[in-house]
Amino acid sequence: TVGLISGTVSLKVAKLAGTQSVNVRSDAAAMGVRGTQFTVTSPPTGDILVTCDEGEVICTDDEGRELAAIPGTVVEKRPGELFRTVPVAVSSLETFRKNWNAERIDALRANALRAIRSFAALYATLSREFNANYAELMKKQAILSKWQEEDRRGKLGSAMEIMREKKDIVRHLFALRRTLFQFERVYFRLVELKVYHDQGYGRGTIAAGETTTQFFQKLESEKKDVMKKMAVIRYVTKLYALRNDGRVPTGLSDEEQEDDGDFFGD
């Protein structure tokens, strides 16, 4: 699975065997493919464009609705709207992608202040949740330090130790990863919006008298702490997966975790 926060990802997937699959996941949709050459584009506006040169891409939104992108038909999704198909000749795909992305960026510049206000409000809420969940995980420092030392030595604890440690940490790690999925997307969209803000777009007041300039200064001052915490969460997730047959926490108890996501992939 490839996580797409913003930008463009192009993949050519050869024939896959068995249960293998390739997926691209954004904050609002998932694209599943087999034997396909395709491109997924997502500008800072949150729009999604899926174009397919060959094969087929199944696009699934966050409510489970599906739509297929095939040669001659692209799929797009705008924030708050459903997927829709648009007919486009395969020979014109590259030009269509460039024009589509340029239109989205022009729209963003025209409505930059509204976008900044929206993402700033989400950031404030998710940041509080993220930091609170992180603090809860850090209360398990004895386990985290033990895992880090075992990782340094290239060893694992006994089966009984691992079972006990996973049980103590699984719910905290699951809650944190669930928040992180949303938080990092909001954070990096704001980082992109700052580029346009620095060019003079979207300047104004956000809320309670705070200006956009003050907000981005605060965002920059928090950057080091945010990036460190994100890195720690990914490292702890890796250490957990090493003790759980390569599977990441789903929020279930250790005894129930039979269908966790595979951290290492196929």
Residue positions per predicted region:
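Flexible, surface-exposed loop/linker segments and immediately adjacent secondary-structure boundaries
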Residues: T1-V75, P79-L156
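Long, low-complexity or tandemly repetitive, helically biased scaffold regions used
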Residues: N111-D266
